[in-house]
Amino acid sequence: MAHKKGGGSSKNGRDSQSKRLGVKVYGGQKVISGNIIVRQRGTQFHAGRNVDIGRDHTIFATASGYVKFHTNKFGKKTISVVTE
């Protein structure tokens, strides 16, 4: 018979790395073609003019200009790049 309890193992102690999601460039800021504007899971934001969407739903600029956040006619949050 043991006179001390065995040291039990913990089932906790794990965590995943942060994915660094969110808005990377805000409204009114200047971007060049290829700049990432938003990293997201699913389409919280939709692509507008001069913007495209990657297969992981990342929104990036396809032209140089200024970022504009707005709502489209269907009520969806949309991001566009306004060229100079």
UniProtKB/Swiss-Prot annotation:
Organism: Brachyspira hyodysenteriae (strain ATCC 49526 / WA1)
Region (Disordered), start-end ranges: 1-21
Keywords from the named record: Ribonucleoprotein, Ribosomal protein
GO biological process, one term: translation
Protein name (record): Large ribosomal subunit protein bL27
Gene Ontology, cellular component aspect: cytosolic large ribosomal subunit
Keyword Ribosomal protein: yes
Pfam families assigned: Ribosomal_L27 (PF01016)
NCBIfam families per record: L27
One term of GO molecular function: structural constituent of ribosome
